[in-house]
Amino acid sequence: MSTFRAKVRREEKFRMKCESGNHTMLLDEPLKAGGTDLAMNPVEALLSALGACKCINAWIFADQFGINLKDIVFEMEGDIGALEKVDNCLPLIFKSIHTKITVF
């Protein structure tokens, strides 16, 4: 089993600085949600991370089985919805996540 760690702290309003090892990235909310729109939002980052995992695994699989790929693109789309109210809060969850894969 491997343990991964990340640290997240507020930079300004809804802009967050995310750190893991020697790497840093920003996450933010769009202007209409009160952010500064200087980076993708956390939901987009989660979809991107899932897509990156799938893409990396596809390249590993192709290499292991001698499949000559020119390129492969994963387009991720997720539908967000609220659960039942818990302690006056509506937690959001993915109701569905879809992946469109284009292979070249």
What residue spans do the PLM features occupy?
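Extended beta-strand/beta-hairpin segments
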Residues: 1-48, 59-104
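Alpha-helical metal-binding/catalytic segments enriched in His/Glu/Asp
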Residues: 50-54
